[in-house]
Amino acid sequence: MPNDNHYIHGAGIDSRLRIPASVGSRIEVRFADVLQRDRYDPLSWRRELLTPVVGEPDWFEIDLDALGLEDGDYEYEFIKNGVDEAPIADPYAVYITRFGGYRGIFQIRQGRRWRQSFTWDDEFTPGNPLRNNHQLVIYEMPMRWMESAPEKARQVGLGTFEKVVFVHLDQLKALGINAIELLPVQDSPDTLNWGYGTRFFFAPDLDMGLPVELKFFVKQCHQRGIRVIFDVVMNHARNCPLAQLDYARYFLSSEDEERSHRGEDYGASLFRYWPDAAGLTPAREFQLHMAEYLITEYHADGFRLDEFKGINHWEFIQQFRDHAWQVHQQAYPDRPFIVIAEDSWRRAAITHQRPQNPNGRKVTDSIWNFAFRDELRRVFSGRLDTAWGEPARRERVRWMVTGGQTWNDWSRQAEAGFHDLSQAVNYLTSHDVEKDDEKRIMNYLLAPLLEERGYRGTVDDIRWLTDHLESGADDQQHFLHGLALERLRSAFCLLLTSVGIPMILAGDEFGDVHDLDHHNWRLKMSDPVDWERLDASPNNRDLWNRVAELIALRTTHPALTRNETTFFYFHPDFDSNQGAKVFAYCRTRGAVLGAMDQIIVVCNIGPESYASYDIPWFWSELSAIDEIAPPQHCRPLEHNDGHGVRLSLAAYQMRVFAT
């Protein structure tokens, strides 16, 4: 377990260092006060022998309180079987340092092990509760993307916990999001990238900040009513000290049978999750300890599990989910919690209570809904076509909005969907932007508009245009940029009124674009948000304001925290590939159409524009209806000559009304 305290049992700081190693090993610890770095020589450091733990011959320990140490902060590392040239860091270290290599740090005060205290007493403020899973709007935050190098041309992410707290949190609070999904912040060799290759599972990345700074970040989020969901990598590890201590018990070799049942290793070491000959699963225990530590020490409000497909072990993931929930409920019985899987095989069934799942129960609470992203992008590119023998376009639209089923474009058929909005995390873009159909949504919308009018829509051209809106871009380019932002507003209308938990990638809220080639797997991870683009033009700021309106609606309107949805209009030729593409739906909150406290969404997903369009209407008092996040230029809602209403609908435009 983490080498600092009995965090579950509340017994305070543990004086022992404990690490796993192969049975029969000789394990020594060598250490020195960090203030002695002017005489840095690890070979001359004090050394002590660890002893095997009684009844656990694959664990070794030493009692630091018994060493008679003077007060100080000590860096330490382990030596296995006398090989001084290959020191090993503590895989359970909770506080690390870097100087000629990575090491853990333990602290001694008055001859006993000590650690810096952290006050959580002021964690919450009046009027800022943590919202439940049905009210969430998640902000996906690659920490390193939150700040770029001063030399703008370099595009290197340098985000830290401190920068986000003091530069961005208030703005995110004003935007209205109430959860942050942190891309991995545990220490990783991929320090300038996303961090999907953890080295130390119990310590934050040194380049992002110290443990106290990550705790302060979480506390500052909680004070603003923002939950923090930790993205954790359990499929594999990169340069993790466990590999030096006991590789065979924690990781797979190419000859292991389990290896053939697993996915990509991404150039790292795959964890071993099948039981060994003795029925033991040390790698599972390692991950369960990690969950406990992040919950109790960092007050995690949930987890996002990377590479569910690659782990390919539903029973273990269910065990992880159940254990995390139990620890969280024990520590914070009145707080919400969630475990989300990233399953690129898109199996909504893992969120269901069904006999085929392990123990007949759900495996995770929620999953990323890839199908929503893909179908929405087909909507805005005019590619949501119907074919003979396949479901009608209106069915595909229903599934996209409600999540009742999901469309698999490879098999060209529908698959099981979701039973509750909290089971699906919907999004326009995620951090993984490599393929053309995955790139930032603003690039996706703007590129074809430029190309249709004879301009180029490459990453470099869009970057140039976005950065020269006030000087250099011609009137046509300026217009097309504004048109793309208007279509992005419409995409947010769909995202924030569909059934599911909406997630927004950092920067999408104001239409940020790629600065680097997203097709390059390295560059795609090193492309920080350009915050200056929030005010690159009045249209960018206007989009941010409209998104804030929609988020406020999503988090406060009762109809959007429930599942009930009724489609009350499709154009008669909607299912024809040449027909008008207008439809309308209502989030009813379970009441009949025409009741108060309902949300109405009118959508045109075709290339035709309508200065005047009539649809049926069930709500009598137009004066009691508010339009939310309206387009900059539109005809207001008005009664027509019959029993409906009339409004304008531009191409690929969505309009949202609240009763």
Placement of each model-derived feature along the sequence:
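The feature marks proteins involved in alpha-glucan
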Residues: 1-21, 44-45, 49-138, 147-156
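Surface-exposed beta-strand/loop patches in extracellular or lumenal glycoproteins
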Residues: 15-22, 27, 605-622
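Substrate-binding/active-site clefts of carbohydrate-active enzymes
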Residues: 93, 123-133, 142-299, 308, ...
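Conserved alpha/beta catalytic core and glycan-binding cleft of carbohydrate-active enzymes
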Residues: 100, 104-107, 321-327, 334-519, ...
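Hydrophobic faces of well-ordered beta-strands that scaffold small-molecule active sites
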Residues: 137-141, 180, 228-230, 303, ...
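C-terminal accessory region downstream of the catalytic core in glycan-modifying enzymes
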Residues: 529, 542, 550-552, 614-641, ...
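Aromatic- and carboxylate-lined catalytic core of secreted/periplasmic carbohydrate-active enzymes
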Residues: 533-574
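C-terminal beta-strand-rich structural cap/linker in extracellular carbohydrate-active enzymes
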Residues: 639-659
